[in-house]
A protein has these predicted regions:
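Short helix-coil boundary/hinge micro-motifs
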Residues: 1-52, 79-80, 134, 145-166
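Short, cationic Gly/His-enriched loop motifs
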Residues: 49-164
Length: 166
């Protein structure tokens, strides 16, 4: 169980919390070319020995439980911020559970259709890593402008997280 606790602590250490009420909790760890956060967890059942989670999906699993997340299939952002991991059990949550068709309707209604295609697959690992670092830097600068009080590290799980560990 100590390992599980360390995984949760490692996850929340990569989250910055906006100080304004209702602000996003931004993932500042690894970021994929699609703009979503990535988080790796050891998984002995995986061929690679670890499993990659999207950061918002991992946060939702910690908060809502794996059965609910698996049943819903999709974790959708109300805030339209792919780096937001603010999953809470109350109305202040920025993430909600839904199905694929609901997620596609929301995405189209908000004009967030994927226009960049799969060009990132043709880039080297070093190029993708450099892009990730540059994107993270731009996101943090933008977030600091959007959050009047700035950002503070969220070093531990929010009170709403029940202690469930995937």
């Amino acid at each position: 169980m100590v390992m599980i606790s360390n995984v949760s602590s490692r996850f929340w250490a990569k989250v910055m919390q906006g100080t304004a009420p209702g602000a996003c909790w931004l993932w500042v760890g690894a970021i994929g070319a699609d703009g979503y956060g990535r988080f790796w967890v050891k998984d002995p059942e995986s061929e690679a020995g670890e499993k990659m989670w999207r950061a918002h999906r991992y946060a939702a699993t910690l908060t809502f439980g794996s059965d609910e997340v698996e049943a819903a299939k999709m974790v959708t952002h109300l805030c339209d911020n792919p780096l937001c991991v603010r999953a809470e059990t109350g109305p202040e949550s920025h993430l909600f559970l839904g199905d694929h068709s609901e997620n596609m309707r929301e995405r189209a209604a908000r004009g967030r259709d994927n226009l960049h295609g799969l060009a990132f697959l043709r880039r080297s690992r070093a190029e993708r890593a450099a892009d990730s670092r540059a994107l993270r830097e731009r996101v943090l600068k933008h977030a600091l402008r959007l959050c009047p009080g700035g950002l503070t590290p969220l070093l531990e799980a929010p009170a709403a997280v029940s202690g469930y560990q995937p």
